[in-house]
Amino acid sequence: MIRVFCKNTGTFKEFQEGTMLLEMIDEFDFEKPYPIIAALVNNVPQGLKFRVFNNRDIEFIDYCSYFGRNVYCRSLCFLLYKATLDIFPDCKVMMRRPISKGFYCSVEKGDGTELSDKDIDLIKQRMSEIVAEAIPFHRHEVPIGEAIEVFRKLGHMDKVKLLETCGEVYISYYTLGGTADYYYDVLVPDAGYLKVWDLTPYRGGAFLRVPNRHHPEDLAPFFEQPKTFEVFAESIRWNKIMGLDNVGDVNRACLDGKATDLIQIAEALQEKKIVQIAEEIDRRYRSGNNARIVLITGPTSSGKSTFCKRLSVQLMACGLHPISFSTDDYFVNRVDTPKLPDGSYDFDNFDTVDHDALQKDVMKLISGKTVEVPEYNFVTGIREYNGKKLKLEEGSILLIEGLHALNPKLLDNIPDAGKFKIFINTITSISLDDHNCIPTSDNRLLRRIVRDFNKGAFSAQETISNWPNVRRAEVKWIYPYQEDADVLFNSAYLVEFAVLRSHAERILATVPKNCPEYSEAHKLIKFLHYFIPVSDKQIPPTSLMRYFIG
């Protein structure tokens, strides 16, 4: 017999060795508002068909949990792939990226045509049939060479290249109704669990809608993100030009000694974009509308500060005189900072910034007056005036950088014609393979973990623990204004994960296995193992990446 502790109930129960998680659920009495779809076993995600042979701590999870959503969405992607292949056996399905609270998918049919509305209806019908039949997902753990041959015979060279370079001995792949595919984490037991979804035509492909995070009986709301989509599409075009569709391609290039070339190309592309932005700011300023306020924002760890410095250099090359400050210097004194329900400070709240004082100072600056601007003392938590004075001369451009820079309330007395808005995000365009895209939030979390640790600010455990609060604040305060920007800048780096691996792995290894944060640390370590590590010696000192890795 084995002894299992259920975190959902805080109780122990005994089971026969080898009992499946699926068989344990009803033995524990706890409220289950939504179906249980997976579990954390000793803080490691496992599918419900996982058999337990030793004493373990178990937490059953549904769609409302972070890991539960990942399991559900991953399974939905396989369902879509299976149904599409059943209708169009010679097609190529590519799950491009999460967008608009769903997934954008492109399909290359054998005859070279795009999906029609009728095609999508046929795929939807087949998906519904598979769900109604509750066809099971079967997991197969095999030597990696065997898995490589499975996918080589299927012509899935994206998976072959990934598996050949990941360095594992054994891996698991899944089958659904005889169709094989690879996913880098667990799935639901069968397709019958996937009751809430929709598939609609979108930009020559299909959009896979998923359940609402808080009310999984309903679909998440859809909203257009045309500017974000175009930035992603531009990155995909460049990846194709370089022949780098997936991580396996990047790994091969690094093994062939081309890592330095990839770094230089990534730097050149970012610098080219910054030059274009500077030239557009210059054009607007000199066109007569006197647009001299540049607002720069983006989520945490997107690279705002370094971008601001590099943009300043290019503005000077245009003959302009950039003057910059951060909204952080206008933070209210710490005693006046808004608080979260648990009593901790809500540093990401819009009212953390004294926007009235900031707006008054900006109005004075653009009217030609000299203004003494504050400097926030993060040690004492007090806004200080230390004699720093600013004045806008002829040709001066004011750069304002911060989390809330694009919030329309920040400078609501200044017409939009006088502002140039820039939103920086980390839009990861590279995928593990055709069916496993990489969440942009993972990109930024890894940056944040490395930066916090190197600066001695927080441990990996502390950074991971606070990340849900950061994400909630971004959704509330930052992302609503993304599409309002005049330009979106993508700070994602083609070989970023390969460079971050050597920094992040050792830091993530410090997270104790017995804490809740280990689940995320384990996931990130497993994810980083797909990348061939690349030295950071060729990363230039002015790179956006350098700020995070030191």
Language model segments and positions:
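Auxiliary tRNA-acceptor-end handling modules of aminoacyl-tRNA synthetases
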Residues: 50-69, 83, 92-99, 104-272, ...
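Conserved NTP phosphate-binding and transfer environment spanning the P-loop NTPase/kinase superfamily
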Residues: 285, 408, 412-550
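Hydrophobic anchor at the beta1->P-loop junction of P-loop NTPases
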Residues: 294-296
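Conserved lysine of the Walker
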Residues: 304
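Hydrophobic positions on the alpha1 helix immediately C-terminal to the Walker A/P-loop
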Residues: 307, 311
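Conserved nucleotide-sensing/catalytic segment adjacent to the nucleotide-binding pocket
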Residues: 332, 336-379
